[in-house]
């Protein structure tokens, strides 16, 4: 009933507008709110001050005219008519408060009260009457809420006993007979009745379920035997691959041994060249760059530095700085070697790029290499 009452009230208000008041509003909309003639009896200081637009000034009218002036509307309303409307509203509110229990128990009493309030609202034009109407709406909404609580709804309730009785009746089981069989524990008829009853219930319930597809085995029936996997036959090609893999490490080992022997021979040859040079001129030191740099080949220069590093590591030669802070190399005698074991040895890394090699050749004016390539090394490089 609260839904019907709330739906009727706006329709009564919309249809019950006073035509005389609508004409008055359209007449007052043509006036500007800030013009001197829009407010009667207003002070000059009040007219000069800018006014903030109210809620009624921002709402557009149905006819497309300007906004309504509330002051002019109140002045044109009959005071006696407004007084009568307020008196009727107060009487209606008092009646609702006194007859609250009757309205809650009756079926159409709340609807009649709302229709009466809609009739009174047709003559409301000022805020005082609108306040009384709002007060009545609060009372009416409380009454509607109370009537809604009185409505009985069984959507969320579940009566278990009633459900069991209905289920037993559908299964064809007499509740009295079932109680006697339950009390008699030695009776064998209970299992038959229970099984037969659930069978009836299952047939009824299976109509509401979708049937699922059965499982089909890819190999046929369950008792079938799985096929025996065929044994793999080893091919002779795999045996040849294993023999080749066993032969490869031996071949690589021989190649590594040949390179190692060539490196040892080259180191001994370079040491012999250094010792021969110092035997011919023992007072003149040999520049390290003049000794290892090959002006015609950058890779050959790198190989010479690599081979000389073994001579320095084994203690057959040493590198020191001369007066110009440039590195020189000289062989070490056997007597000096035995006495120099207590000296601290330093390890260094030489970084040489192609540009550095060109600059060294140009600065030291190296034209011919001191370490010439041997025939065995030429054969290996070829």
Curated annotation (Swiss-Prot):
Post-translational modification Phosphoserine, affected residues: 374
Source species, domain of life: Eukaryota
Signal sequence annotation: none
Biased composition (Low complexity): 31-41
Single Gene Ontology BP annotation: DNA damage response
Residues with PTM Phosphothreonine: 342
InterPro entries: Nse4/EID (IPR027786), Nse4_C (IPR014854), Nse4_Nse3-bd (IPR029225)
Region (Disordered): 1-80
Phosphoprotein found in the keyword field: yes
Keywords: Chromosome, DNA damage, DNA recombination, DNA repair, Nucleus, Phosphoprotein, Telomere
Basic and acidic residues composition bias: residue spans: 1-21, 42-55
GO cellular component: chromosome, telomeric region; nuclear body; nucleus; Smc5-Smc6 complex
Localization: Nucleus; Chromosome, Telomere
Task of the protein: Component of the SMC5-SMC6 complex, a complex involved in repair of DNA double-strand breaks by homologous recombination. The complex may promote sister chromatid homologous recombination by recruiting the SMC1-SMC3 cohesin complex to double-strand breaks. The complex is required for telomere maintenance via recombination and mediates sumoylation of shelterin complex (telosome) components.
Family statement: Belongs to the NSE4 family.
Subunit-structure text: Component of the SMC5-SMC6 complex which consists at least of SMC5, SMC6, NSMCE2, NSMCE1, NSMCE4A or EID3 and NSMCE3. NSMCE1, NSMCE4A or EID3 and NSMCE3 probably form a subcomplex that bridges the head domains of the SMC5:SMC6 heterodimer. Interacts with NSMCE3.
Record's protein name: Non-structural maintenance of chromosomes element 4 homolog A
């Amino acid at each position: 009933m609260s839904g019907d009452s709330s739906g009727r009230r706006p329709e009564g208000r919309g249809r019950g507008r006073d035509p005389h008041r609508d004409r008055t509003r359209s007449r007052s909309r043509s006036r500007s709110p800030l013009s001197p003639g829009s407010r009667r009896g207003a002070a000059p200081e009040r007219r000069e001050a800018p006014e903030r637009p109210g809620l009624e000034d921002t709402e557009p009218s149905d006819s497309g005219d300007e906004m309504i002036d509330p002051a002019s509307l109140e002045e044109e309303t009959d005071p006696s008519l407004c007084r009568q409307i307020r008196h009727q509203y107060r009487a209606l509110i008092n009646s609702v408060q006194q007859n609250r229990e009757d309205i809650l128990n009756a079926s159409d009493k709340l609807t009649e009260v709302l229709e009466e309030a809609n009739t009174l609202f047709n003559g409301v034009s000022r805020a005082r009457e609108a306040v009384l109407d709002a007060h009545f709406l609060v009372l009416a909404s409380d009454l509607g809420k109370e009537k809604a609580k009185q409505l009985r709804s069984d959507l969320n309730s579940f009566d278990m006993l009633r459900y069991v009785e209905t289920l037993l009746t559908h299964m064809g089981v007499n509740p009295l007979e079932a109680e006697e069989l339950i009390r008699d524990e030695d009776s064998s008829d209970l299992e038959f009745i229970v099984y037969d009853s659930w069978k009836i219930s299952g047939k009824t319930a299976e109509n509401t379920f979708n049937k699922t597809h059965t499982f089909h085995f890819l190999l046929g029936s369950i008792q079938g035997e799985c096929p025996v996997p065929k044994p793999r036959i080893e091919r002779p090609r795999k045996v040849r691959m294993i023999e080749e893999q066993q032969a490869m490490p031996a071949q690589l080992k021989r190649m590594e041994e040949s390179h190692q022997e060539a490196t040892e021979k080259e180191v001994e040859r370079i040491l012999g060249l250094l010792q021969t040079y110092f035997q011919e001129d023992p007072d003149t030191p040999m520049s390290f760059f003049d000794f290892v740099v090959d002006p015609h080949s950058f890779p050959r220069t790198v190989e010479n530095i690599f081979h000389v590093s073994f001579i320095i590591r084994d203690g057959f030669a040493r590198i020191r700085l001369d007066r110009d802070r440039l590195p020189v190399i000289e062989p070490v005698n056997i007597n000096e070697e035995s006495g120099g074991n207590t000296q601290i040895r330093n390890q260094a890394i030489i970084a040489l790029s192609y540009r550095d090699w060109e600059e060294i050749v140009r600065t030291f004016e190296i034209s011919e290499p001191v370490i010439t390539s041997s025939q065995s090394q030429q054969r290996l490089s070829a």
